[in-house]
Amino acid sequence: MPPSTDSSRRNSEEGSSDGFKLDSSALNKPPEEVFDIVGKLGEGSYGSVHKAIHRESGHVLAIKKVPVDTDLQEIIKEISIMQQCKSKYVVKYYGSYFKHSDLWIVMEYCGAGSISDIMRARRKPLSEQEISAVLRDTLKGLQYLHDLKKIHRDIKAGNILLNTDGIAKLADFGVAGQLTDTMAKRNTVIGTPFWMAPEVIEEIGYDTKADIWSLGITAIEMAEGRPPYSDIHPMRAIFMIPTKPPPTFKKPEEWSSEFNDFIRSCLIKKPEERKTALRLCEHTFIKNAPGCDIMQLMIQDAQEKAILGQAPMAASSGNDATLLSEGMSTMIDGGESTLVQHKDNYVTAQSLRSQMESLRIGGEIPKSAYIPGSSKNGNSPRVQPPGHTASASDPSKNQPFAQDGTGPNFQLGTSESSYKDASYNMMNTEAEYENRFQRAVVDGDFEFLRNITLDELIRRKESLDSEMEEEIRELQRRYKTKRQPILDVIEIKKRLQ
């Protein structure tokens, strides 16, 4: 179901004023004949971001080069979502190219970089007025996405970009964000959970209100330079966020009552009690936000500081993506309700080219791209279209949102005796238990836990906290051991200069 008439009118009024467009002839050419790459803006686990010039028009663009060794179906789906977003508060997507084993994603160039870049260049957080101006634009972007029943799921300062006019735009919510997550998992890099809403961590199902929590955390990040819990181990933060009271400013008295109230409105543990982006736009703190002039002054100050410090102002590389559970795309498309299911229709691989054309993707599909259902004998796979969810024949993949339960999955209809046959009846020693548990982590088979008494399970659960604390202390000791010699040599070299 499309957005309401009021929403449609508002979206039209706030549509991107950028008239640049890649025509069909440009999409049918090799990308190096269409663009001149003039410099690298950043690099992350997903690949690299480059500043580029469109040869014919001279238009400045950003191009993300992403290695394509992931599910092509997911790429098609996410590009479809990106193409639908037409708001001046969301980074615009122009088209994509397959080039060898990479996907080149052509997007709007935001010359002032991200809010994280601004803070790094100035070496200080934002002022309260600057924060309110950033939040105003960000809320308009979120309101637009939420009207379309889409969830960003990665709101943070590094994913809010600024153009030179001082307009804040949401970024890294489409295919690049999805591929960032995929590449991070492949490289065993664990993302940071500090911006994640409690319901996302607990996997109890969530909707657009998860973005509102992340926005509240981002507001604190802009005010204090880092999000709450960032001084502790990420794995410990995962336990603390759902169980502790909502975070607040370290020194609430330093901020206005309106700003404190805005934070409280965002950081409510129960998502149903959080305000929507539309309602937050009416908050006093947002309605009193200054115009773009203050943003332009902030950008100018950051650029001057960057020149003095020889730190280039560039689009954020986005290599600190929020921890996401496996199998989750960065944005979720949907229909009428907020928690949405997708249409159950299929297309064959033969129609993939027509999909690519409609989504403005040029070039040949790389051999490294994975197409679900393909086989080594060359049989045509069945490719699911953008926004598709698995059919009833595969109920395990039929939910677009995180679902209940984070523990082991036991097959239904299996008798108690079969569990005993499949695992040890007793864990006689600590060594035996640890060995069995380590194997279970690798194999994903935790059935042996069913044969341990309830009291023993509770005891072992309680011991995990102390074990985690010890592991964190050991990690810190190893970090300091490696870091100190480097600091010592740096100090010696400084003295010799």
Curated annotation (Swiss-Prot):
EC number: 2.7.11.1
Keywords: ATP-binding, Coiled coil, Kinase, Nucleotide-binding, Phosphoprotein, Serine/threonine-protein kinase, Transferase
InterPro entries in the record: Kinase-like_dom_sf (IPR011009), Mst1_2_SARAH_domain (IPR024205), p53_tetramer_sf (IPR036674), Prot_kinase_dom (IPR000719), Protein_kinase_ATP_BS (IPR017441), SARAH_dom (IPR011524), STE20/SPS1-PAK (IPR050629)
Stretches assigned to the SARAH domain: 446-493
Active site: D154 (proton acceptor)
Class in the EC hierarchy, top level: transferase
Coiled coil: 450-486
SUPFAM superfamilies: Protein kinase-like (PK-like) (SSF56112)
Expression across tissues: Widely expressed in epidermal cells.
Gene3D superfamilies hit by this protein: p53-like tetramerisation domain, Transferase(Phosphotransferase) domain 1
PTM annotation: Proteolytically cleaved by caspase-3 during apoptosis which results in kinase activation. Phosphorylated.
Catalysed conversion reaction: L-seryl-[protein] + ATP = O-phospho-L-seryl-[protein] + ADP + H(+); L-threonyl-[protein] + ATP = O-phospho-L-threonyl-[protein] + ADP + H(+)
SMART domains registered for this protein in UniProt: S_TKc (SM00220)
Cellular component per GO, a single term: cytoplasm
Polar residues compositional bias, start-end: 390-416
GO biological process: determination of adult lifespan; intracellular signal transduction; muscle cell development; negative regulation of canonical Wnt signaling pathway; peptidyl-serine phosphorylation; positive regulation of apoptotic process; protein tetramerization; regulation of MAPK cascade
Gene Ontology molecular function: ATP binding; protein serine kinase activity; protein serine/threonine kinase activity
Region (Disordered): 1-27, 367-416
Site (Cleavage): D333, G334
Co-factor requirement: Mg(2+)
Recorded family membership: Belongs to the protein kinase superfamily. STE Ser/Thr protein kinase family. STE20 subfamily.
Role of this protein: Serine/threonine-protein kinase which extends lifespan and delays tissue aging, probably by activating daf-16.
PANTHER family referenced in this protein's UniProt entry, alphabetically: FI20177P1, STERILE20-LIKE KINASE, ISOFORM B-RELATED
Protein name in UniProt: Serine/threonine-protein kinase cst-1
Source species of the chain: Caenorhabditis elegans
Lineage of producing organism: Eukaryota, Metazoa, Ecdysozoa, Nematoda, Chromadorea
